[in-house]
Amino acid sequence: MKFSIIYEAQMVDTSRENEARCFHEIIEQAVLAEEMGFDTVWAVEHTALTQYAHMSAPETFLAFLAGKTTRLGIGHGVVCLPPAMNHPVKVAERIATLDILSNGRVHFGMGKGGTQQEAGTFGYDLGELQPMIDESMYLIPKIMVQDEIEHDGAHIRIPRRPIHPKPYQDPHPPLYMACTRADALTTAGARGIGALVLGFAGPDDIASKNAIYRAAWASRRAEDQVGFRPTEHLAALCPALVLDDREKARKIGLRGQRFFVESLGYWYQGGPKPTVEDLSGDEQAAILQQEKAAVVAYLSEEKISIGTEHTGAYEEVQDAYGTPKDCIRYVQRLFDAGADEILFLFQMGAVPHEAIMETIRNIGTHVIPHFRAQAELAAQ
Protein backbone atom coordinates (compact mmCIF):
# COMPACT_ATOMS: atom_id res chain seq x y z
CA MET A 1 0.00 0.00 0.00
CA LYS A 2 1.60 3.23 -1.20
CA PHE A 3 0.38 6.79 -0.63
CA SER A 4 1.55 9.52 -2.99
CA ILE A 5 0.67 12.97 -4.34
CA ILE A 6 0.63 14.06 -7.97
CA TYR A 7 0.99 17.68 -9.09
CA GLU A 8 -0.04 19.55 -12.24
CA ALA A 9 0.79 23.04 -10.91
CA GLN A 10 -2.77 24.06 -11.71
CA MET A 11 -3.91 27.60 -11.02
CA VAL A 12 -6.78 30.03 -11.59
CA ASP A 13 -4.67 33.19 -11.36
CA THR A 14 -1.86 32.92 -13.92
CA SER A 15 -0.02 36.11 -12.98
CA ARG A 16 3.74 35.82 -12.52
CA GLU A 17 3.39 36.48 -8.81
CA ASN A 18 0.83 33.72 -8.28
CA GLU A 19 2.65 31.32 -10.57
CA ALA A 20 5.79 31.67 -8.44
CA ARG A 21 3.77 31.39 -5.24
CA CYS A 22 2.14 28.19 -6.50
CA PHE A 23 5.46 26.43 -7.10
CA HIS A 24 6.86 27.39 -3.71
CA GLU A 25 3.65 26.25 -2.01
CA ILE A 26 3.89 22.89 -3.79
CA ILE A 27 7.43 22.44 -2.47
CA GLU A 28 6.22 23.27 1.05
CA GLN A 29 3.42 20.72 0.66
CA ALA A 30 5.79 18.05 -0.63
CA VAL A 31 8.26 18.56 2.23
CA LEU A 32 5.38 18.19 4.69
CA ALA A 33 4.25 15.07 2.84
CA GLU A 34 7.61 13.43 3.54
CA GLU A 35 7.28 14.30 7.23
CA MET A 36 3.76 12.82 7.30
CA GLY A 37 4.76 9.48 5.81
CA PHE A 38 3.80 9.78 2.14
CA ASP A 39 5.80 7.58 -0.22
CA THR A 40 6.26 9.57 -3.45
CA VAL A 41 5.53 12.93 -5.06
CA TRP A 42 4.83 12.70 -8.79
CA ALA A 43 4.98 15.57 -11.28
CA VAL A 44 3.29 15.65 -14.68
CA GLU A 45 4.74 17.25 -17.80
CA HIS A 46 2.58 19.54 -19.92
CA THR A 47 3.40 22.46 -22.21
CA ALA A 48 1.26 25.48 -23.15
CA LEU A 49 -1.85 24.43 -21.19
CA THR A 50 -2.63 27.68 -19.36
CA GLN A 51 -4.34 27.20 -15.99
CA TYR A 52 -4.67 23.42 -16.39
CA ALA A 53 -0.98 22.57 -15.90
CA HIS A 54 2.04 24.83 -15.50
CA MET A 55 4.34 21.89 -14.62
CA SER A 56 6.32 22.13 -17.85
CA ALA A 57 9.82 21.38 -16.49
CA PRO A 58 9.31 18.52 -14.01
CA GLU A 59 12.98 17.52 -14.15
CA THR A 60 13.89 20.88 -12.61
CA PHE A 61 11.08 20.79 -10.07
CA LEU A 62 11.90 17.23 -8.99
CA ALA A 63 15.63 17.94 -8.71
CA PHE A 64 14.88 20.86 -6.41
CA LEU A 65 12.49 18.69 -4.39
CA ALA A 66 15.07 15.91 -4.12
CA GLY A 67 17.44 18.38 -2.48
CA LYS A 68 14.77 19.34 0.06
CA THR A 69 13.95 15.75 1.07
CA THR A 70 15.75 12.57 2.08
CA ARG A 71 13.28 9.67 1.85
CA LEU A 72 10.44 10.77 -0.44
CA GLY A 73 10.16 9.04 -3.81
CA ILE A 74 10.70 11.35 -6.81
CA GLY A 75 8.24 10.48 -9.58
CA HIS A 76 8.02 11.56 -13.21
CA GLY A 77 4.35 11.07 -14.02
CA VAL A 78 5.11 11.23 -16.90
CA VAL A 79 7.95 12.38 -19.18
CA CYS A 80 6.59 13.15 -22.66
CA LEU A 81 8.71 11.24 -25.17
CA PRO A 82 8.31 12.92 -28.58
CA PRO A 83 11.98 13.29 -29.63
CA ALA A 84 11.81 17.02 -30.35
CA MET A 85 10.32 17.55 -26.90
CA ASN A 86 12.57 15.18 -24.96
CA HIS A 87 15.28 13.38 -26.91
CA PRO A 88 15.87 9.88 -25.48
CA VAL A 89 19.56 10.53 -24.82
CA LYS A 90 18.75 13.63 -22.77
CA VAL A 91 15.96 11.82 -20.93
CA ALA A 92 18.32 8.99 -19.98
CA GLU A 93 20.97 11.46 -18.81
CA ARG A 94 18.51 13.49 -16.74
CA ILE A 95 16.87 10.46 -15.12
CA ALA A 96 20.24 8.95 -14.22
CA THR A 97 21.53 12.21 -12.77
CA LEU A 98 18.37 12.73 -10.72
CA ASP A 99 18.57 9.14 -9.49
CA ILE A 100 22.18 9.66 -8.36
CA LEU A 101 21.49 12.95 -6.60
CA SER A 102 18.42 11.52 -4.84
CA ASN A 103 20.25 8.32 -3.83
CA GLY A 104 17.98 6.07 -5.84
CA ARG A 105 14.54 7.59 -5.25
CA VAL A 106 13.41 8.07 -8.86
CA HIS A 107 10.29 6.54 -10.42
CA PHE A 108 10.22 7.01 -14.21
CA GLY A 109 6.88 7.27 -15.99
CA MET A 110 6.61 7.67 -19.78
CA GLY A 111 3.93 8.97 -22.13
CA LYS A 112 3.20 11.21 -25.09
CA GLY A 113 1.15 14.16 -23.82
CA GLY A 114 -2.53 14.40 -24.55
CA THR A 115 -3.32 17.44 -26.70
CA GLN A 116 -2.63 18.85 -30.13
CA GLN A 117 -1.80 22.11 -28.33
CA GLU A 118 1.28 20.40 -26.89
CA ALA A 119 2.20 18.29 -29.91
CA GLY A 120 1.90 21.29 -32.22
CA THR A 121 4.23 23.33 -30.03
CA PHE A 122 7.02 20.96 -31.08
CA GLY A 123 5.95 20.59 -34.71
CA TYR A 124 4.02 17.33 -34.44
CA ASP A 125 0.53 16.12 -35.17
CA LEU A 126 -0.85 14.31 -32.12
CA GLY A 127 -1.98 11.37 -34.21
CA GLU A 128 1.54 10.62 -35.48
CA LEU A 129 3.26 10.39 -32.10
CA GLN A 130 2.68 6.83 -30.89
CA PRO A 131 5.33 5.08 -33.04
CA MET A 132 7.89 7.65 -31.86
CA ILE A 133 6.87 7.11 -28.24
CA ASP A 134 7.18 3.34 -28.57
CA GLU A 135 10.63 3.60 -30.13
CA SER A 136 11.86 5.97 -27.44
CA MET A 137 10.32 3.89 -24.64
CA TYR A 138 12.30 0.81 -25.63
CA LEU A 139 15.46 2.81 -26.28
CA ILE A 140 15.83 4.84 -23.07
CA PRO A 141 16.40 1.90 -20.69
CA LYS A 142 19.07 0.56 -23.05
CA ILE A 143 20.83 3.93 -22.97
CA MET A 144 20.77 3.86 -19.16
CA VAL A 145 22.24 0.34 -18.98
CA GLN A 146 24.57 -0.25 -21.94
CA ASP A 147 28.15 1.07 -21.99
CA GLU A 148 27.56 2.39 -25.51
CA ILE A 149 24.42 2.91 -27.55
CA GLU A 150 23.91 2.87 -31.31
CA HIS A 151 20.45 3.12 -32.82
CA ASP A 152 19.09 3.49 -36.35
CA GLY A 153 15.33 3.53 -36.05
CA ALA A 154 12.37 4.87 -37.97
CA HIS A 155 12.27 8.11 -35.96
CA ILE A 156 15.47 8.24 -33.89
CA ARG A 157 19.08 7.85 -35.03
CA ILE A 158 22.04 7.82 -32.64
CA PRO A 159 25.62 7.07 -33.73
CA ARG A 160 27.64 4.81 -31.43
CA ARG A 161 28.24 6.81 -28.26
CA PRO A 162 28.96 6.26 -24.55
CA ILE A 163 26.21 7.99 -22.56
CA HIS A 164 26.77 9.06 -18.94
CA PRO A 165 25.99 8.90 -16.08
CA LYS A 166 24.32 5.60 -15.22
CA PRO A 167 21.49 5.50 -12.66
CA TYR A 168 22.00 4.88 -8.95
CA GLN A 169 19.40 2.08 -9.08
CA ASP A 170 20.61 -1.06 -10.82
CA PRO A 171 19.80 -1.57 -13.64
CA HIS A 172 17.56 1.53 -13.72
CA PRO A 173 14.62 3.13 -11.87
CA PRO A 174 11.22 1.39 -12.03
CA LEU A 175 9.30 2.17 -15.23
CA TYR A 176 5.66 3.18 -15.68
CA MET A 177 3.23 4.27 -18.39
CA ALA A 178 0.44 6.83 -18.25
CA CYS A 179 -2.76 4.82 -18.68
CA THR A 180 -6.30 6.09 -19.13
CA ARG A 181 -7.64 3.91 -21.93
CA ALA A 182 -7.95 0.13 -21.87
CA ASP A 183 -5.45 -0.32 -24.70
CA ALA A 184 -2.79 1.55 -22.71
CA LEU A 185 -3.33 -0.74 -19.72
CA THR A 186 -2.92 -3.75 -21.99
CA THR A 187 0.28 -2.27 -23.40
CA ALA A 188 1.72 -1.52 -19.95
CA GLY A 189 1.00 -5.04 -18.74
CA ALA A 190 2.35 -6.66 -21.90
CA ARG A 191 5.54 -4.58 -21.66
CA GLY A 192 6.10 -5.46 -18.01
CA ILE A 193 5.92 -1.94 -16.59
CA GLY A 194 3.73 -0.13 -14.08
CA ALA A 195 0.42 1.57 -14.90
CA LEU A 196 -0.37 5.10 -13.73
CA VAL A 197 -4.15 5.33 -14.07
CA LEU A 198 -4.46 9.09 -14.39
CA GLY A 199 -8.16 9.38 -15.23
CA PHE A 200 -10.91 10.14 -12.71
CA ALA A 201 -11.83 6.48 -12.32
CA GLY A 202 -13.93 5.41 -9.36
CA PRO A 203 -13.43 2.08 -7.59
CA ASP A 204 -15.58 0.05 -9.99
CA ASP A 205 -13.66 1.38 -12.97
CA ILE A 206 -10.34 0.80 -11.22
CA ALA A 207 -11.38 -2.82 -10.68
CA SER A 208 -12.05 -3.31 -14.39
CA LYS A 209 -8.82 -1.54 -15.35
CA ASN A 210 -6.92 -3.64 -12.84
CA ALA A 211 -8.31 -6.82 -14.41
CA ILE A 212 -7.17 -5.67 -17.87
CA TYR A 213 -3.70 -4.78 -16.61
CA ARG A 214 -3.16 -7.98 -14.58
CA ALA A 215 -4.36 -10.19 -17.45
CA ALA A 216 -1.91 -8.52 -19.84
CA TRP A 217 0.84 -8.84 -17.26
CA ALA A 218 0.18 -12.55 -16.75
CA SER A 219 0.41 -13.27 -20.48
CA ARG A 220 3.35 -10.98 -21.30
CA ARG A 221 6.24 -12.22 -23.43
CA ALA A 222 9.91 -11.71 -22.66
CA GLU A 223 10.54 -10.12 -26.05
CA ASP A 224 8.01 -7.35 -25.31
CA GLN A 225 9.62 -6.28 -22.03
CA VAL A 226 10.52 -2.60 -21.80
CA GLY A 227 13.73 -2.20 -19.86
CA PHE A 228 15.43 -4.66 -17.57
CA ARG A 229 13.34 -4.37 -14.41
CA PRO A 230 9.76 -5.72 -14.60
CA THR A 231 7.44 -3.62 -12.42
CA GLU A 232 3.94 -4.94 -11.70
CA HIS A 233 2.22 -1.94 -10.15
CA LEU A 234 -1.08 -0.10 -10.61
CA ALA A 235 -1.44 3.42 -9.21
CA ALA A 236 -4.90 5.03 -9.09
CA LEU A 237 -5.66 8.75 -9.12
CA CYS A 238 -7.70 9.93 -6.12
CA PRO A 239 -8.86 13.58 -6.00
CA ALA A 240 -9.20 14.41 -2.31
CA LEU A 241 -9.54 17.07 0.34
CA VAL A 242 -9.58 15.88 3.94
CA LEU A 243 -10.59 18.41 6.60
CA ASP A 244 -12.19 18.22 10.02
CA ASP A 245 -15.24 20.01 8.55
CA ARG A 246 -16.89 17.60 6.06
CA GLU A 247 -19.06 20.16 4.27
CA LYS A 248 -16.16 22.59 3.90
CA ALA A 249 -14.02 19.81 2.42
CA ARG A 250 -16.77 18.87 -0.04
CA LYS A 251 -17.44 22.45 -1.09
CA ILE A 252 -13.80 23.36 -1.66
CA GLY A 253 -12.77 19.98 -3.06
CA LEU A 254 -15.62 19.58 -5.52
CA ARG A 255 -15.18 23.17 -6.70
CA GLY A 256 -11.51 22.38 -7.32
CA GLN A 257 -12.29 19.19 -9.21
CA ARG A 258 -14.91 20.99 -11.27
CA PHE A 259 -12.28 23.54 -12.31
CA PHE A 260 -9.91 20.67 -13.11
CA VAL A 261 -12.46 18.92 -15.32
CA GLU A 262 -13.51 22.13 -17.06
CA SER A 263 -9.95 23.26 -17.76
CA LEU A 264 -9.13 19.79 -19.03
CA GLY A 265 -12.18 19.95 -21.30
CA TYR A 266 -11.11 23.38 -22.54
CA TRP A 267 -7.73 22.12 -23.76
CA TYR A 268 -8.69 18.59 -24.78
CA GLN A 269 -12.06 19.30 -26.41
CA GLY A 270 -12.28 23.03 -27.04
CA GLY A 271 -14.92 23.51 -24.34
CA PRO A 272 -15.65 26.73 -22.45
CA LYS A 273 -13.13 28.22 -20.07
CA PRO A 274 -13.35 26.90 -16.49
CA THR A 275 -15.26 28.68 -13.74
CA VAL A 276 -14.71 29.16 -10.01
CA GLU A 277 -18.31 29.77 -8.95
CA ASP A 278 -18.76 29.72 -5.17
CA LEU A 279 -21.49 27.10 -4.74
CA SER A 280 -22.31 24.53 -2.09
CA GLY A 281 -20.84 21.06 -2.21
CA ASP A 282 -24.08 19.52 -3.48
CA GLU A 283 -24.42 22.20 -6.18
CA GLN A 284 -20.82 21.69 -7.32
CA ALA A 285 -21.33 17.92 -7.42
CA ALA A 286 -24.52 18.25 -9.45
CA ILE A 287 -22.85 20.49 -12.04
CA LEU A 288 -19.80 18.23 -12.16
CA GLN A 289 -22.06 15.26 -12.87
CA GLN A 290 -23.47 17.12 -15.89
CA GLU A 291 -20.09 18.13 -17.28
CA LYS A 292 -18.04 15.03 -16.66
CA ALA A 293 -19.39 12.54 -19.18
CA ALA A 294 -18.23 14.11 -22.45
CA VAL A 295 -14.79 15.10 -21.15
CA VAL A 296 -13.96 11.80 -19.54
CA ALA A 297 -15.40 9.65 -22.31
CA TYR A 298 -13.13 11.50 -24.71
CA LEU A 299 -10.09 10.80 -22.54
CA SER A 300 -10.64 7.32 -21.25
CA GLU A 301 -14.09 5.92 -21.90
CA GLU A 302 -14.84 6.02 -18.18
CA LYS A 303 -17.08 7.89 -15.73
CA ILE A 304 -15.95 10.09 -12.88
CA SER A 305 -17.28 8.77 -9.60
CA ILE A 306 -18.65 11.75 -7.68
CA GLY A 307 -21.32 11.30 -5.04
CA THR A 308 -23.73 14.01 -3.95
CA GLU A 309 -24.43 12.60 -0.49
CA HIS A 310 -22.43 11.23 2.42
CA THR A 311 -24.40 9.08 4.85
CA GLY A 312 -21.41 7.34 6.40
CA ALA A 313 -22.24 3.96 4.87
CA TYR A 314 -19.21 2.27 3.31
CA GLU A 315 -20.97 1.59 0.01
CA GLU A 316 -22.11 5.20 -0.38
CA VAL A 317 -18.78 6.96 0.08
CA GLN A 318 -18.15 7.94 -3.53
CA ASP A 319 -15.18 10.30 -3.15
CA ALA A 320 -12.46 11.38 -0.76
CA TYR A 321 -13.83 14.83 0.04
CA GLY A 322 -14.67 14.91 3.73
CA THR A 323 -13.24 13.80 7.06
CA PRO A 324 -10.40 11.33 7.60
CA LYS A 325 -13.00 8.58 8.11
CA ASP A 326 -14.58 9.40 4.74
CA CYS A 327 -11.15 9.25 3.10
CA ILE A 328 -10.34 5.92 4.74
CA ARG A 329 -13.56 4.38 3.44
CA TYR A 330 -12.99 5.58 -0.11
CA VAL A 331 -9.30 4.63 -0.20
CA GLN A 332 -10.24 1.17 1.08
CA ARG A 333 -12.49 0.79 -1.96
CA LEU A 334 -9.58 1.67 -4.26
CA PHE A 335 -7.29 -0.85 -2.60
CA ASP A 336 -10.05 -3.47 -2.75
CA ALA A 337 -10.32 -2.73 -6.48
CA GLY A 338 -6.67 -3.67 -6.96
CA ALA A 339 -4.71 -0.42 -6.63
CA ASP A 340 -1.16 -0.75 -5.31
CA GLU A 341 -0.71 3.00 -4.86
CA ILE A 342 -3.02 5.98 -4.29
CA LEU A 343 -2.12 9.08 -6.31
CA PHE A 344 -3.77 11.82 -4.27
CA LEU A 345 -4.66 14.94 -6.24
CA PHE A 346 -5.15 17.93 -3.93
CA GLN A 347 -3.89 20.86 -5.97
CA MET A 348 -6.89 21.64 -8.19
CA GLY A 349 -8.25 25.01 -9.27
CA ALA A 350 -8.67 27.40 -6.38
CA VAL A 351 -8.14 24.90 -3.55
CA PRO A 352 -6.15 27.01 -1.05
CA HIS A 353 -2.69 26.11 0.18
CA GLU A 354 -3.86 25.99 3.81
CA ALA A 355 -6.54 23.40 2.98
CA ILE A 356 -3.97 21.23 1.18
CA MET A 357 -1.59 21.43 4.14
CA GLU A 358 -4.40 20.42 6.51
CA THR A 359 -5.27 17.55 4.17
CA ILE A 360 -1.68 16.29 4.14
CA ARG A 361 -1.57 16.42 7.95
CA ASN A 362 -4.91 14.61 8.29
CA ILE A 363 -3.94 11.86 5.87
CA GLY A 364 -0.55 11.47 7.51
CA THR A 365 -2.04 11.41 11.00
CA HIS A 366 -5.11 9.26 10.40
CA VAL A 367 -5.32 7.62 6.97
CA ILE A 368 -1.81 6.31 6.35
CA PRO A 369 -1.38 4.89 9.88
CA HIS A 370 -4.76 3.12 9.56
CA PHE A 371 -3.67 1.24 6.46
CA ARG A 372 -0.13 0.60 7.64
CA ALA A 373 -1.49 -0.97 10.84
CA GLN A 374 -3.90 -3.01 8.74
CA ALA A 375 -1.03 -4.26 6.58
CA GLU A 376 1.07 -5.17 9.62
CA LEU A 377 -1.80 -7.23 11.07
CA ALA A 378 -2.30 -9.01 7.76
CA ALA A 379 1.40 -9.87 7.63
CA GLN A 380 1.38 -11.53 11.05
Specify the residue positions occupied by each region the protein language model found.
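Alpha-helix-loop-beta-strand connector modules within alpha/beta enzyme cores
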Residues: 52-76, 132, 136, 360-376
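Glycine-rich anion/phosphate-binding loops
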Residues: 20-25, 83-97, 319-327
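Hydrophobic faces of well-ordered beta-strands that scaffold small-molecule active sites
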Residues: 3-7, 41-43, 74-76, 106-110, ...
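Internal, glycine-rich beta/alpha segment that forms the wall or movable "lid"
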Residues: 84-196, 203-231
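Glycine-rich, proline-tolerant flexible connector loops at the mouths of alpha/beta enzymes
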Residues: 40-65, 80-82, 114, 118, ...
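N-terminal beta1-alpha1-beta2 module of alpha/beta enzyme domains
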Residues: 1-76, 170-173
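Conserved, mostly hydrophobic/aromatic
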Residues: 37, 45, 65, 98, ...
